[in-house]
Design a protein with these regions (language model features):
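Metalloprotease/metallohydrolase-associated module, dominated by Zn2+-dependent proteases
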Residues: 216-306
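Generic alpha-helix detector with strongest preference for long hydrophobic helices that associate
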Residues: 7, 96, 100, 175-180, ...
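Acidic/polar, low-complexity intrinsically disordered N-terminal segments immediately downstream
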Residues: 19-116, 126, 281-306
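Sec-dependent bacterial lipoprotein signal peptides
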Residues: 1-22
Length: 306
């Protein structure tokens, strides 16, 4: 028994000595942040990215490739690489197609600095830190491609922006040539997209003050059968909706919108019209006005700044 105790004590002292000689231990599995610029880099782009993060609490990207690392060689002796890119996936619902985005990049520092100046002057003043995207991808052009079979993609449309959970991409090409009204419209559309994405991710409790007016009707058919789109919109507004149900770009008559469609339409209404304008335009539809006020409170609580 005494021998056993001595062996245990000796092992314990050995472990203490070994740990003491190793110094402070650090976790070996810390994941590298590939969104962040190298803080020791001296090139102008890296300095711009670091300064932006310090000021604005979001990462800044000019390329959707986060890392491109060699893995080794294949059996033919050719190099293999691991590529990680920014994934701005299109939000998948029952009425959207899987899609991807193809980007063209800004090529000069003047373009990149101009893009940063634009978002700092026009977008960030409306977004508190908690509402800002994790990262901004500022590029020249965005093209959206969709697929029917999940394998082959076909061109769908050019986009001025794309909003994802980890990144918001903005097409900044030609921005300096836009009129003041066009620049304002671009700003408004981006803010609307960011808020629509943010609101769609909120809990039922956060959205309860809004969805309580329409949750029983989402995605259901009306007992009435409107013959025209105008008749359909009267039916929608009477029930508190400002948008019909859409499949792609096509409205369905007599079918109430989904929850996501209802949220998105009212976020846009709140960001584009004042309370006085809404009360005038929807004077005959009191539920619409109540939902407008409820949504306005929600986005203010999320950090939107008027």
């Amino acid at each position: 028994m005494k021998i056993d105790k001595l062996v245990i004590l000796s092992c314990f002292l050995f472990i203490l000595t070994a740990c003491g000689n190793e110094g402070t231990l650090s976790p070996s599995n810390i994941k590298e942040n590939y969104y962040a610029a190298d803080s020791t880099a001296t090139d102008l782009e890296s300095q711009l990215k670091c300064a932006f993060y310090k000021r604005d609490s979001s990462y800044l990207l000019f390329n959707d490739t986060l890392r491109y690392e060699p893995l080794g060689k294949d059996t033919n002796g050719d190099m293999l690489y691991y590529t990680e890119t920014v994934d701005i996936g299109y939000v998948m619902t029952s009425n959207t197609m899987p899609s991807k985005y193809i980007y063209q990049y800004l090529t000069t520092m003047n373009e990149k600095q101009g893009a940063v100046d634009f978002i700092e002057a026009n977008l960030l003043p409306h977004l508190s830190v908690k509402l800002r995207p994790f990262s901004w991808l500022l590029i020249n052009h965005i093209a959206k491609y969709i697929t029917d079979d999940g394998v082959s993609y076909s061109y769908d449309s050019d986009k001025s922006y794309a909003v994802g959970d980890r990144c918001t991409a903005l097409a900044m090409g030609g921005l300096s040539n836009l009129s003041d009204s066009a620049r304002a419209a671009f700003t408004q559309s981006v803010l609307t997209g960011i808020l629509q994405n943010k609101v769609s991710k909120q809990t039922s409790e956060t959205l309860q003050s809004f969805v309580k007016y329409g949750s029983a009707l989402y995605g259901t058919s009306s007992s009435e059968s409107p013959a025209t789109e105008d008749e359909n919109m009267v039916l929608m507004k009477t029930s508190g909706f400002i948008s019909p149900y859409y499949w792609g770009d096509y409205p369905y008559l007599g079918l109430y919108p989904s929850k996501d469609q209802d949220l998105a339409s009212f976020v846009e209404l709140v960001l584009t019209q004042t309370a006085d304008e809404v009360e005038s335009a929807y004077a005959d539809y009191p539920i619409v006005i109540k939902k407008y006020n409820a949504m306005k409170k929600i986005i203010i609580n999320l950090g939107y700044i008027y």
